[in-house]
């Protein structure tokens, strides 16, 4: 009996774009739930508003381009971008900020370059940087975590502040800790205190800190880490970029901490503060804007981790993942060019 051998590949993975996006969104949910638990319903409101704007903008652009609206919406890429923007901005930021940011991400960053698969920059991070540069006060005004807050916003409070309706609530009352002092994020607090001459140990006696990490933020990062590990298990992402991000940040922060423990945050503090785990597993791993080869992905991720540490400690913004990711996006083509495997019979590069 003669057997016919089919052409390669002989093993395939039936993972469509929509399936991958669905898995990423589902793995984001633990982090979203924990974030809402510590920072109130505002985060969920921002996410839902971002989804509405993203899907509307996606449909409008597809109609203008005379493409299939149903096919574009069903790939879930616009929804994922919306969720990432929603969890990245302060929970009680004005409604028009999330509208501007999400519309910019979908219309300009994604579709101006040709749509899904053609954008040069991560849409969510480009939107975040636009908002941070344009509205720095609103983008750096976080409320106190619920466990140390004097007052926690209810659903009604969140809606009133986000949509600026009613006059019986004020943002300032939700920034107060149990000691009556207005709170910033742990990264912001440490950076400000160090610039005022306090040591790391003195700064971390404040209520916003819980041991070596920040109140609430440790658990938020732990939840995103758990979701990220599930993503790896499901093979929705590869390990190279996430490992590179965490390794680069860990090594850079370890060197800084060893050289000056009184003026630098510990590696544990950097790994479990701000958007570290969210960015490492859900943002930096965007396959469109990252390097493509295994070695290139490791370099890409490591570059992000090192840039985050440099900007956090030397720059003007306490959390730096958006800038680090966009800078690495710029470097991705060069990384691919110099580390791509040599084709047989041709020189490398």
From Swiss-Prot:
It comes from the Bacteria. It is found in: Cell inner membrane. The chain crosses the membrane at residues 20-42, 77-99, 124-144, 212-232, 239-259, 265-285, 291-311, 315-335. Its cofactor is FMN. The modification FMN phosphoryl threonine is found at residue 185. Its main location: membrane. GO terms for biological process: electron transport chain; transmembrane transport. Its EC number is 7.-.-.-. Keywords: Cell inner membrane, Cell membrane, Electron transport, Flavoprotein, FMN, Membrane, Phosphoprotein, Translocase, Transmembrane, Transmembrane helix, Transport. The keyword Cell membrane applies. The keyword Flavoprotein applies. It is a multi-pass membrane protein. InterPro entries: NqrB/RnfD, RnfD_bac. GO terms for cellular component: plasma membrane. Belongs to the NqrB/RnfD family. Part of a membrane-bound complex that couples electron transfer with translocation of ions across the membrane. The complex is composed of six subunits: RnfA, RnfB, RnfC, RnfD, RnfE and RnfG. This is Ion-translocating oxidoreductase complex subunit D. The gene is rnfD.
